[in-house]
């Protein structure tokens, strides 16, 4: 009996130490696309009609924003091969001053998409428990590798955007990989997606209107406390992406 209680205590302790998620995370139900949308920065495909818009409304860094300076929203659809995002932004000034895609990419205007394939939460700073794709205006996608250095993961994605005055339409598609992904091999294969699958998911935007560093960081999830810029480290901040028919 004492041995049983000891095992129970160990199990309870293990559960309490498992990585989790912050309270009050959002859930986005993404409908399956009968035909995949074209990733062309237009956003007029039928695949988008059933997907709901979700705002980027949580200011993680920077002072109060005027609506003329920035507005953002997104929607998501999927096929068994990958997920697709359609994003619409109002941004009066676009900045891309760091020509080396691996240098200070977060201080330019940058779209960020965070994905935790198995919805496990937890740390992903220097591992692939989750991916934090930083999409630059040149459509490259950067994250930090297991060697603790920025790497291009542009081969995981397709990205296109178009601008009309201050309005930007941005479309991306993303292959989904497990946390077994290895940077040192070329045999990684994306998972096959299915209705009912849950993933950790979050969208954010770095806005720079001409400063040396980004002036605002706006996300799709509420971040409590003083350290709001932690999505690149902690997948517990992510919301939930639920794939539905």
Predicted regions and their residues:
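Hydrophobic h-region of N-terminal signal peptides that target proteins for export
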Residues: 4-15
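Structural preference for beta-rich elements and adjacent junctions enriched in aromatics
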Residues: 14-245
């Amino acid at each position: 009996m004492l041995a049983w209680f000891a095992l129970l205590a160990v199990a309870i302790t293990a559960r309490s130490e498992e990585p989790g998620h912050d309270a009050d995370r959002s859930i986005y139900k993404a409908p399956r696309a009968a035909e995949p949308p074209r990733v062309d920065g237009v956003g007029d495909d039928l695949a988008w009609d059933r997907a709901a818009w979700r705002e980027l409304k949580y200011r993680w860094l920077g002072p109060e924003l005027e609506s003329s300076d920035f507005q953002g929203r997104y929607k998501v659809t999927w096929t068994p091969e990958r997920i697709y995002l359609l994003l619409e932004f109002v941004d009066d000034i676009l900045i891309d001053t760091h020509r080396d895609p691996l240098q200070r990419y977060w201080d330019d205007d940058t779209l960020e998409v965070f994905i935790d394939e198995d919805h496990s939460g937890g740390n992903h700073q220097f591992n692939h428990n989750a991916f934090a794709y930083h999409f630059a205006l040149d459509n490259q996608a950067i994250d930090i590798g297991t060697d603790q250095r920025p790497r291009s993961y542009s081969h995981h994605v397709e990205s296109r955007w178009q601008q009309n005055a201050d309005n930007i339409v941005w479309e991306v598609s993303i292959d989904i990989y497990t946390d077994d992904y290895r940077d040192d091999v070329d045999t990684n294969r994306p998972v096959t997606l299915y209705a009912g699958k849950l993933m950790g998911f979050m969208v954010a935007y770095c806005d720079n209107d001409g400063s040396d560093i980004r002036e605002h960081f706006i996300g799709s999830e509420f971040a409590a406390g003083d350290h709001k810029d932690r999505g690149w480290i902690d997948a517990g901040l992510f919301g939930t992406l639920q794939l539905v028919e």
